[in-house]
């Protein structure tokens, strides 16, 4: 029976014959068909429904077949089949609701509702898709759904068993879902609730047996009460009347009393919740504001007249007024003329935010202020030197936060926080105190925890000035009061996450407290001590451990004496000091009762008495190196926060909404039960959040069924219609199972238009101004276009001109939203072709789909119009005269338009060249000049030149003769020559001389035929001289290889102009113009020597000059004789001079091997830099730089040992054993090579005894503190030249030589930390020294009995070296230092030596979190992030990492990629995150959901970038 597979090949066309549809019913009724083939057919059918329109004649058969499957197969036996058929049914309902809603007749709707609500397993994974399907039917026929649900509640049943009560419960839950859908879609959900309240009353009065089981009845009553209480708030007068009326209508007294008791318990529960919080928030906030008291301001600034508010009816008018009011802020510079205007405009802005728009339409208002850049422009006023203007701007931002609070996205809150933070350090105390006050009110006003604001507040503790650090202590206190776990659980009933964001940031809080309590300023210390006890109140275990282990006894005592009395903390003081009374005043400041909570003075103004041990102390800068290890759960960095912090979730930005969805999905998935179909279910109901809706990640189903992967996606894709996350508390409370996470309802299509009646649509479309309205209008337009495509020709046509102006505006603003429209024929026929071309380009539409209808021989005008439109677009882009409103749009997509249309034209001409269709070619041939000339004109713009020249070549092949004529007539010679060059590469028969001639290349004066022959020659001579001068200045001859053109022959003297390359102008030596060309001539360092054109009188005897080696002093003494050179203690490089001109190091004959002229020279031998002896340094070398040993040798030693780099003797390349332990091309090898002296055979200069004596002297000199660079060289040379030498080995191991050298090396590294700047030479040599010691350590380990494979001894020896190098890097101002490169190479060697382990990553993360110094260049942080990347690349270290470790790395890197403008941090952290993703993908238990959870701290676009980087590693 496998033949049915052939019946499904042609099912994408909506007009296909019924016989071509999926034979679902036939196959599933046939018992002989194996279940695997049935599931394969059903899988393909599901993919078809998700991606394409269905055959309308088969819709009823499809519904019958899918309902048959659920009734014929048991879920226990076929769980995969039942779930697959259910999801297919739900997608089919969504498809039919969109494509052909008339199919939903009354009988079918009732059957579907009965099946979706009652006949499926009582599991959430089925409930989720069922609600989505019911929603689709409800949007088509809401009244029918309401009537059926009400009828389900009306049906009496004499036998009220458990099944009956379950039916009622399922019906009630469905009603709740519908009300919730109406509420989310901004419909009148209360009206729908009132409709069903009548059914609730009838159910309780008539259909619920009062004598039945009380537990079952109570479940129904509680569910009804929860539904009503959920939408009818008890504090609303009208809602209270509805509740009272409902209770009065109940006839069964038992049920009435139950309802009344539920209402009372709900009120009591609410009041108990308010009283059970850890802190009295109102009182605590008063104390915080007293700490950050607003300075005494004038009445105009501090007070706000409630009557002064401005209301708007139109959002466009609001935006226009905002732009006008912000005009004075456009100028960066504040002038005498504009500052008063700025202040008055801020007051007007304050009136606007007090009006109706921010309250009634907060999301749209936020969008407007983003577009007009309100925050950026107001920030210019906050930094004004005029105090009144600055304070006015600050208070305006404060009121803006208070009015919008959680409606403001994190990006705007971040901007405002930074504005306030910058003013904390202001020299004007009134500005600083006002900014302090505004920062505290910012945290008080927001209701959601934002990790970015938490991190910014934490960084304030590192500021240099006192006020930011004091503010940081108060901000931490506000976070603890506002976002502690008790507040989180009480204010968010849906929250079940085991940890809060604040709890996951405990490591930051602890470091925060340690820095504040040990601060040098008393005000900061005292404020942080009070904050500590708020931390103790929230997390007593962590606070006790911190107090006992992280503070000195003095600081601990001072902290214990600062316990606020009003917190009622039960803490036993370790030992009460006799001076406790001295600090009691501080405690009394926080012991006021709530009746006397308003204090007249702030803590900043109190005169404080403190004991001697609490005097200002210096904060420790080294305690952070020993940060405690993190827990296995990875709670050091914040990982997740439940999306149910408040019922009024902020969804004003795509980022925040996606974050909420991801958190909800993670939260629900924590409770999932793993079963046999978990993998399939996840694939069906979930998609990767970072993937776009049309990605393959969203359409993938079970790995066993991938037969429909090749389905086309050019129609409306329903893949994501059933996969958006949501959470309903009633489902969690009343559903029996929690198998899979729930999902939120998609944005519905609002309204319904009858066919042919488009006036309402036109008005709704043109009036749409808010983003939500525009999105709804587009969805409705899409639906109407799909419906009208099936109408008869007599039906009214949709008039695109009625909405074209608005449609164009939306295209400019959101062109990607039109991708699904490009496959709708009605849309492509109604929209102008030039708009379509732009949409095709931006959405990367398939070229074949465009040309399928455009290259029809019967309609050649279609192709002609397409080419003309593209040419006009090129002209428009080249002219660059677009309207101001569209400039940004064309600037953004200009390159995209060019590249896409190049490829589109390439396909057109390629097809024309292959098919040779005369009809199409004739129409195109007339357009060839136009398209060719515009292509010539746009050369030089920003686009893909490979595609450009491929298109040029195809047009050239289309009609090469005509193309050559067009190109020859083109004016710009440079463009012409480049095109000719590319065509010459592609076509061997192409001749450049046919295109470029003298007349077309150089502009000459026209020849007068009346002139005499002598005049003509004179004119030619002038022209030729001009050309000659032009070529001499540039040294380039553009007319090479053009000997055939007689007009280019120079008539002066051909012999005077010769060139070895035909493109460089060469003068005769006697020519007076030679000096100009010699000065401007450019000679490559790899160019072969040319014969020396020296004159005879300037000749010098080469051999005689080679015999003498002149010193600089001998030249000054005019002595030509050789003198005996003396070797000083500190030798300097000697330079040998010669009378010959400088020569290139490599001789011509050396560059060509075996006489083969075509053989390419070795680039290594051609390099002018030679680290080792070079074989090519022959007698022609005239400049030699010598490096000699800094060793005091005897004259005999010098004569016998020293190496001379002389011209008459070739030196051998040295190779030492230790060199094999360094990378070949490393900077370490380069530096080492300059320390060595070898003779011509490469042997070492001295024996071990000589080296050892020098090394011993150097150790003593360095320890005494008086040494030079040569003494450091003495330490390094024996380690290199005597590597694996037995005497050296014995001394290092048996005589404690290794430890002695290591101590000296650490001493040298520490000496670099004593100065503000880095001594580069000492630092470089010190790193080379420890690098050599590391190589020796690895060698010595191999000689021991127990080889150190795990790097234990290496870590013990080089731990302090690593710390000193990090301290050194902290002083760097840039990355262009050789010390940084040497440190990188040393770090890589440590990596290979197993120095780094899993705990090393934890310490690095701790340093990155706690030791960030904003006033440095961040070189150290970049180095540490690079180290993490290296560790993640090491397989041995990666095996030690757990997911919690990877999560910590991801959370920390999220700050460095998003929370800073340092590009080096951004790049290196992005690479680390990409590597983390690769590591997670290689784990055995890898799942996309888990990865999304780990990366949910990143915005969607950043995560996409990380995925791209990871895929290209």
From Swiss-Prot:
Q: Which GO molecular function, any one, fits this protein according to its record?
A: microtubule binding
**Any idea where this protein resides?**
Nucleus; Cytoplasm, Cytoskeleton, Spindle; Cytoplasm, Cytoskeleton; Chromosome, Centromere, Kinetochore
Q: Where is the composition biased (Basic and acidic residues)?
A: 1122-1133
Name-wise, this protein is Protein STU1
Q: Which gene encodes it?
A: STU1
- Please state the protein's primary subcellular location: nucleus
Question: Has the keyword Nucleus been applied to this entry?
Answer: yes
Q: Where is the composition biased (Polar residues)?
A: 670-684, 692-701, 1103-1121
Per the record, the similarity remark reads: Belongs to the CLASP family.
GO process annotations (BP)? astral microtubule depolymerization; attachment of spindle microtubules to kinetochore; cell division; mitotic spindle assembly
Bias-annotated ranges (Low complexity): 586-603
Decide whether keyword Cell division is in the record.
yes
GO cellular component terms?
cytoplasmic microtubule; kinetochore; microtubule organizing center; mitotic spindle; mitotic spindle midzone; nucleus; polar microtubule; spindle microtubule
List the residue ranges of the region (Disordered). 586-605, 648-701, 1089-1180
Q: How does it assemble?
A: Self-associates. Interacts with microtubules via the TUB2 subunit.
Phosphoserine: residues bearing it: 997, 1018, 1063, 1167
Q: Known Pfam families for this protein?
A: CLASP_N (PF12348)
State the source organism's domain of life: Eukaryota
Q: Which UniProt keywords apply?
A: Cell cycle, Cell division, Centromere, Chromosome, Cytoplasm, Cytoskeleton, Kinetochore, Microtubule, Mitosis, Nucleus, Phosphoprotein
The job of this chain, per UniProt, is described as:
Microtubule binding protein that promotes the stabilization of dynamic microtubules. Required for separation of the spindle poles during mitotic spindle formation. May cross-link overlapping antiparallel microtubules in the spindle midzone.
Q: What more is known?
A: Present with 521 molecules/cell in log phase SD medium.
Q: Which residues carry this modification: Phosphothreonine?
A: 1047
């Amino acid at each position: 029976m496998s033949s049915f597979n052939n019946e499904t090949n042609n099912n994408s066309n909506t007009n296909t014959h019924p016989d071509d549809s999926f034979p679902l019913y036939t196959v599933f009724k046939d018992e002989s068909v194996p279940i695997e083939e049935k599931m394969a057919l059903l899988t393909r059918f599901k993919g078809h429904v998700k991606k394409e329109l269905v055959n309308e004649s088969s819709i009823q058969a499809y519904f019958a077949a899918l309902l048959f499957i659920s009734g014929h197969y048991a879920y226990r036996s076929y769980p995969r089949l039942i779930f697959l058929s259910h999801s297919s049914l739900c997608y089919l309902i969504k498809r039919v609701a969109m494509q052909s809603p008339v199919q939903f007749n009354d009988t079918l709707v009732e059957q579907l509702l009965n099946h979706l609500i009652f006949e499926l397993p009582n599991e959430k994974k089925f409930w989720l898709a069922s609600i989505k399907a019911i929603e689709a039917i409800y949007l088509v026929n809401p009244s029918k759904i309401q009537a059926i649900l009400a009828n389900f509640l009306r049906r009496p049943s004499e036998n009220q068993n458990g099944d009956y009560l379950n039916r009622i419960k399922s019906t009630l839950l469905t009603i709740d879902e519908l009300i919730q859908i109406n509420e989310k879609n901004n419909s009148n959900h209360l009206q729908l609730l009132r409709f069903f309240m009548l059914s609730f009353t009838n159910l309780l009065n008539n259909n619920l047996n009062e004598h039945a089981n009380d537990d079952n009845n109570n479940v129904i009553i509680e569910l009804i009460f929860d539904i009503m209480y959920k939408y009818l708030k008890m504090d609303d007068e009208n809602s209270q009347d509805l509740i009272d009326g409902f209770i009065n209508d109940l006839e069964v007294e038992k049920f009435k009393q139950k309802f009344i008791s539920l209402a009372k318990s709900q009120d009591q529960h609410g009041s108990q919740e308010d009283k059970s919080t850890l802190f009295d928030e109102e009182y605590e906030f008063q104390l915080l504001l007293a700490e950050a008291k607003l300075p005494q301001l004038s009445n105009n600034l501090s007070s706000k007249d409630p009557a002064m508010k401005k209301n708007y009816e139109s959002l466009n008018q609001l935006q226009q007024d905002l732009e006008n009011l912000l005009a004075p802020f456009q100028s960066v510079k504040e002038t005498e003329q504009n500052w008063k205007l700025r202040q008055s405009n801020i007051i007007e802005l304050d009136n606007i935010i007090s009006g109706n728009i921010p309250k009634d339409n907060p999301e749209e208002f936020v969008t407007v202020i983003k577009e007009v850049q309100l925050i950026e422009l107001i920030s210019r006023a906050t930094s004004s030197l005029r105090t009144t203007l600055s304070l006015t701007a600050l208070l305006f931002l404060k009121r803006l936060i208070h009015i919008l609070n959680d409606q403001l996205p994190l990006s705007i809150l971040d901007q405002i926080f930074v504005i306030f933070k910058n003013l904390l350090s202001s020299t004007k105390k009134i500005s600083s105190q006002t900014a302090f006050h505004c920062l505290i009110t910012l945290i008080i006003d927001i209701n959601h925890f934002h990790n970015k604001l938490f991190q910014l507040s934490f960084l304030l503790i590192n500021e240099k000035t006192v006020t930011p650090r004091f503010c940081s202590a108060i901000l931490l206190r506000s976070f603890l009061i506002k976002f502690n776990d008790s507040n989180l659980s009480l204010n968010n009933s849906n929250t079940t996450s085991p940890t809060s964001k604040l709890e996951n940031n405990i490591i930051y809080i602890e470091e925060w407290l340690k820095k504040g309590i040990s601060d040098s300023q008393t005000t900061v210390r005292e404020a942080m001590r009070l904050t500590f006890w708020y931390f103790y109140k929230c997390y007593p275990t962590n606070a006790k451990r911190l107090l006992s282990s992280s503070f000195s006894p003095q600081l601990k005592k001072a902290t214990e004496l600062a316990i606020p009395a009003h917190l009622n903390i039960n803490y036993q003081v370790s030992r009460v000091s006799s001076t406790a009374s001295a600090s009691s005043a501080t405690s009394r400041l926080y012991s006021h009762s709530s009746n006397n909570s308003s204090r007249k003075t702030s803590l900043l103004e109190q005169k404080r008495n403190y004991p001697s041990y609490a005097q200002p102390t210096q904060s420790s800068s080294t305690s952070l190196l020993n940060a405690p290890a993190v827990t296995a759960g990875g709670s050091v960095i914040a990982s997740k926060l439940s999306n149910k912090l408040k019922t009024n979730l902020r969804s004003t930005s795509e980022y925040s909404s996606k974050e909420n969805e991801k958190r909800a999905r993670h939260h629900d998935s924590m409770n999932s039960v793993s079963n046999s179909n978990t993998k399939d279910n996840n694939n069906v109901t979930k998609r990767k959040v970072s993937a776009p809706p049309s990605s393959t990640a969203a359409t993938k189903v079970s790995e066993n069924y991938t037969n429909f992967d090749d389905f086309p996606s050019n129609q409306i894709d329903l893949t994501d219609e059933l996969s958006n996350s949501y959470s309903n508390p009633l489902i969690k409370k009343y559903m029996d199972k929690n198998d899979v996470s729930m999902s939120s309802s998609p944005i519905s299509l609002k309204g319904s238009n009858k066919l042919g009646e488009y006036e309402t649509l036109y008005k709704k479309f043109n009036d749409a101004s808010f983003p939500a309205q525009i999105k709804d209008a587009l969805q409705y337009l899409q639906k109407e276009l799909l419906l009208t495509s099936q109408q008869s020709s007599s039906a009214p046509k949709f008039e695109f001109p009625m909405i074209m102006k608005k449609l164009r505006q939306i295209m400019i603003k959101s062109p990607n939203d039109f991708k699904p429209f490009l496959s709708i024929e009605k849309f492509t026929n109604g929209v102008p072709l030039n708009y379509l071309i732009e949409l095709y380009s931006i959405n990367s539409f398939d070229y074949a789909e465009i040309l399928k209808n455009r290259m029809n021989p019967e309609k050649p005008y279609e192709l002609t119009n397409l080419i003309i439109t593209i040419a006009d677009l090129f002209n428009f882009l080249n002219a660059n005269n677009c309207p101001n409103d569209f400039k940004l749009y064309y600037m953004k997509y200009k390159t995209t338009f060019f590249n896409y249309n190049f490829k589109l034209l390439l396909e057109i001409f390629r097809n024309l060249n292959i098919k040779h269709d005369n009809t199409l070619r004739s129409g195109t041939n007339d357009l060839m000049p136009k398209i060719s000339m515009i292509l010539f004109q746009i050369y030089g713009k920003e686009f893909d030149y490979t595609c450009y020249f491929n298109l040029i070549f195809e047009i050239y092949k289309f009609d090469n003769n005509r193309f050559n004529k067009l190109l020859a007539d083109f004016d710009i010679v440079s463009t012409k020559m480049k095109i000719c060059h590319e065509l010459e590469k592609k076509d061997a028969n192409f001749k450049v001389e046919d295109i470029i001639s003298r007349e077309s290349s150089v502009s000459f004066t026209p020849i007068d035929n009346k002139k005499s022959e002598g005049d003509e020659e004179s004119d030619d001579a002038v022209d030729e001289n001009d050309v000659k001068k032009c070529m001499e200045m540039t040294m380039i001859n553009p007319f090479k290889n053009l000997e055939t053109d007689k007009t280019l022959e120079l008539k002066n003297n051909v012999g005077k102009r010769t060139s070895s390359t035909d493109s460089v102008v060469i003068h005769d030596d006697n020519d007076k113009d030679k000096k100009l060309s010699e000065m401007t001539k450019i000679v490559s360092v790899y160019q072969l020597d040319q014969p020396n054109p020296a004159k005879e009188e300037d000749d010098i005897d080469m051999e005689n000059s080679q015999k003498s080696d002149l010193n600089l002093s001998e030249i000054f003494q005019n002595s030509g004789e050789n003198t005996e050179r003396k070797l000083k203690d500190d030798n300097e490089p000697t330079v040998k001079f010669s009378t010959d001109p400088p020569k290139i190091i490599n001789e011509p004959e050396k560059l060509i091997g075996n006489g083969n002229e075509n053989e390419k020279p070795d680039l290594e031998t051609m390099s002018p830099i030679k680290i080792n002896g070079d074989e090519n340094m022959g007698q022609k070398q005239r400049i030699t730089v010598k490096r000699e040993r800094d060793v005091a040798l005897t004259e005999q030693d010098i004569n016998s040992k020293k190496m001379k780099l002389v011209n008459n003797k070739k030196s051998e390349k040295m190779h030492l054993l230790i060199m094999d332990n360094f990378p070949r091309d490393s900077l370490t090898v380069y530096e080492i090579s300059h320390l060595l002296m070898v003779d011509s055979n490469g042997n070492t200069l001295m024996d071990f005894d000589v080296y050892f004596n020098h090394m011993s002297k150097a150790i003593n000199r360095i320890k005494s503190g008086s040494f030079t660079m040569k003494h450091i060289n003495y330490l390094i040379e024996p380690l290199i030249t005597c590597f694996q030498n037995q005497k050296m080995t014995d001394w290092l191991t048996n005589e404690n030589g290794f430890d002695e050298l290591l101590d000296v090396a650490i001493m040298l590294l520490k000496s670099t930390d004593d100065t503000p700047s880095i001594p580069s030479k000492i630092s470089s040599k010190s790193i080379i020294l420890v690098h050599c010691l590391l190589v020796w350590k690895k060698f010595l380990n191999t000689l021991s009995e127990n080889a150190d494979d795990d790097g234990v001894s290496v870590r013990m020896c080089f731990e302090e070296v690593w710390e000193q190098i990090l301290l050194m890097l902290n002083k760097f101002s840039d990355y262009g230092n050789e010390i940084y490169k040497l440190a990188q190479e040393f770090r890589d060697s440590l990596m290979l030596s197993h120095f780094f382990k899993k705990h090393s990553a934890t310490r690095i993360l701790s340093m990155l979190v706690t030791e960030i110094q904003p006033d440095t260049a961040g070189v150290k942080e970049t180095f540490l992030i690079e180290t993490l990347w290296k560790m993640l690349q090491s397989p041995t270290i990666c095996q030690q990492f757990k997911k919690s470790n990877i999560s910590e790395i991801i959370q920390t890197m999220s700050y460095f990629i998003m929370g800073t403008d340092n590009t080096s941090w951004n790049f290196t952290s992005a690479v680390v995150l990409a590597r983390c993703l690769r590591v997670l993908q290689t784990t055995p238990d890898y799942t996309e959901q888990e990865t999304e959870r780990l990366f949910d701290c990143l915005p969607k676009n950043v995560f996409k970038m990380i995925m791209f980087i990871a895929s290209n590693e």
